[in-house]
Amino acid sequence: MIKRQHIVPEFFAEAEAMREALDACFKDAYNHKIHWQYFCDPRRYTYLRTTPQGVFPQAVLERFLQHLRQWCMQSLGLVPMGVPKLHLMVNGCRLGLHSDFHNGAWGYVYSLTRWQERRFSGGETLLMRDGIPSYKRHHAQDDSLYELIPAIFNQLLIFDDRIVHATPPIEGSMDPLEGRIALVGHIRASSPQVSGSLPPTVVRKVILDAMVQLRERVRTYKDVQGTVTYELTIGTTGTVESATSLTDNIITPATGYAHSDAVAAVRLITQQAMSGLKFPASMGRSTVIVPVLIPLPDLRPIEWVIAHNMPRGVLRTWAQSRLGSVAGLELQGAWEGEGETFVVREPVAGNIRIEAGQISACFDPPMWVPSQRENFQIALSAWLQSASASVDMEVDLPQQQCAPERGPARVNS
């Protein structure tokens, strides 16, 4: 079971192909331009970043992302959040001390740095140790306060996003070929993942009902927080044959990852709840990955309805061309039926329906901290509003069509 941090060496078989594509861009800057964002807040960070789609061959990048997702699901029971950013750090670049509690359950750094041949100092990932600062410890310095993890080529580092971390300043070359290069992103929970005989909608309903009860049982443990994921094996009778923890970063702020009676109690209650789930009987076994956020979040579904007076065919065409690339949503799924329902698998199960006179969206309650849910709702609302607004439709509408009025939105959030 993975806790706090974890390193996977030699992570991706095509790392050299990715690095060679990047080197080709650097060596021939006139013909292979990379549009970097100079990301600078002098108090906190200075580095360059870009999207990897314009750097790596599409097929290689897709295989990397698929491999990353598969590893995350098998090892953590969680999924990466969209496409990572490509970071470049040369002389003078740094990342100051910070934590990413609102970004995900885990952060990751996949290094494409030629670490063994580097001509700079700095550039490691600095992770503060638990219990820092402590006024009871005297003469503490260096590795007693933090851990430095080198950015070795083709290494995947994951760590608890709540850990205060940094990248020490780079001192050395300005040549990007000799810089610190990494893909950086975050990992979070998705809806329960189901394989086998049981219908996913039935499984999710059973789990959601159990979460409501679990929330009441752990409510008194106010200082316990984190995410634990379980891999459940369900027999043909519907009973849980095994409940295995894949990852567990449940802690208290006071104890960190050290022993805590409160954490142990919450783990036991949660394990018992997962082991005691009862599903319908089926023709074969099923496997379910279940993430649990402690404290339990808002368990109401995310629901939106917004009016429109567009022809459904026009609206459907518009939505199909734009839905998969909405920033902040990162929806993965497929259009079903007559192409009027987009069934979402990730990051949270749900659907978007284009109906006569209205667009409706309904998603399962995600196992995310409140700020992550809020950001998702804001992005979803913005997309639905743009879908109903004439200004975004004009390119698709025949000229004689009248522009629709924007309808009121209704939300249960």
Mark where each language-model region is.
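A conserved amphipathic terminal alpha-helix motif
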Residues: 372-402
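Terminal, regulation- and interaction-focused segments at domain boundaries
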Residues: 300-329
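Short, flexible surface segments
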Residues: 121, 152-153
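Ser/Thr-rich, low-complexity intrinsically disordered terminal regions
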Residues: 322-351
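Charge-biased low-complexity segments
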Residues: 140, 144-146, 153-156, 162, ...
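Conserved double-stranded beta-helix
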Residues: 30-133, 162, 186, 288-299
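Non-heme Fe(II)/2-oxoglutarate
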Residues: 1-73, 200-213, 225, 235, ...
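Beta-strand/loop substructures that line and gate deep hydrophobic ligand-binding cavities in soluble
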Residues: 346-381
